[in-house]
Amino acid sequence: MIGVRLKSDLGLLSFVLLIFLLPSSAMADAPLLAGAAALEITPVDDQGRLRQEPYEDRNKNGRYDAPDPDRPRQRGEPFTDLNGNGKWDGPFLAGFFHHGPYYTATGVHDPLWARALVLEQGETTLAIVALDVVGLLYPEVAQIRERVADLGLTQVIVAATHTHGGVDTLGLWGPNFSIDGKDPRTMEQIRSRTEEAIRRAWAARRPARLSWGKGRPLSRFGILINDLRNPVVIDDELRVMRAEALDGKTIATLINWSPHPETVGAGSSLITSDFPHYLRKGIEEGGFSVGWRRAEGIGGVAIYLSGSVGGLLTPLRIPIRDEEGEPIPERSWSKARRIGEIAAWTALEALRDQPPRPIVRIEVRSKTLFVPFDNPFLRGLYEKGLFQRETYRDGKPAGKEGPDLLTEVNVINFYGEEGIAAQFITLPGEPFPETILGGHLTEKKRCWTYTGRKRELGGSGRERIGPAHPDIAPEPVLGEKMAGDYRFVVGLGNDELGYIVPANDFVPPRLKPKLRYGADRCGDDDHYEEIVSAGSRMAPRVVETLVELLK
């Protein structure tokens, strides 16, 4: 069905829902074509130096000091405003939402990438792009789609790996909460090179076959994913898809896993994609060992997609071991390497002996929806101009005055001869693992208990089991609605609206006398995720919309 457009009853859903059932091939004999490409998006100039405007380092601290509206005497250091936008533009590092001094990059540990895969079958041509950035807003994705409109693509999925070692692409990590941290030159570089990566992947299409796999990284080397927020639900399954040419050579390998790419922590000032760098390199080139077995690379372009990173799944605060069984230092490059290589080994093993599966049809389903923007902290930053996007009221553009944000979700079905073989869903932010796997907080009377799983993760064993709002029902579990043997969850897909916090546990931040996490009825004041979430009703809207698409 082509070009179907429906409009929901506003009285029933209280927001406009646009449904696009995008073209899909019904011809079982249509050949599958695949092409891939990778281009660097590291913010450096032609000489390989970090891109930044010249400034006078008067206090010799090695970084630019900006004016602070809360400290009138801090006027800021002189700089050359090359683009005339009234602020210093440089490589502000993004990801760690701290309240201390901002920090800028001082060098590059490994390059950042735009990695694209284009799949075509019959009337459907799909582009999937992964960017080594903390996130990309929906209006930026729209610009990229416009630039490649002439290719006639059915859909373009642009997802962020969510690395915490890249530069600010949202505007939230500038020198203070009044100055946008994005560099216009870097943003244009990301747009243009993402466009070029898609074009190169499209031009490289050739007959291909798909194979699939899944696995869990070997636990004998330590727990690789920690869960810092109750309930403890860890999505540790690694999903992988390989596109190979008819001669058996790899075109691309797509990997989907869930820990935050933040292994080296906030102490590093070097640009990095974190463990995905080692994961991708390991799949492409091999040359590492896990369990004293040597890995052989399979070539092609490795593409990493973050999954259910919210809630909060991280490689921090947990020990892992090397080949000798020795602990690896926390927040280190060696830990990032080890995690990436174990994940690469898992992906390679998952693909071993997996024959290509015939794919008779690719179907793409997309819906736009409106998410209430009711986080008072982010709303205040938005009104200051730290990030730019339209708001909406009753489905119509409303400048900065509307209560809603426009975003999008997608479902991609890969049909085999016996039905759906693999399925992808995209979410416009950081989904909690319980949204995918179940295990929401539901206890109405008790708040706390003691569990072995919290002790395993290095805690005291005390675990909260009561939600902040016990009278609010949890959202449906998306994993139970999905189909196929291989179920890919793409977080930060086409947008970054922050953490998609289950509505029954959303506690807004406190703004006075200073910014603090909210506290719930159980006395738990570790509600960090709500500070960087669009709002309290995002999870129900996103989940309900995806459930409709999955029917």
Language-model-detected regions and their locations in the chain:
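Bacterial N-terminal signal peptides
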Residues: G11-P23
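Conserved beta-alpha junction segments in alpha/beta enzyme cores
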Residues: D29-A160, V167-R338, L351-K551
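Sec/Tat signal peptide C-region and signal peptidase I cleavage site
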Residues: S24-A28
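N-terminal secretory signal peptides that target proteins for export/translocation
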Residues: M1-L10
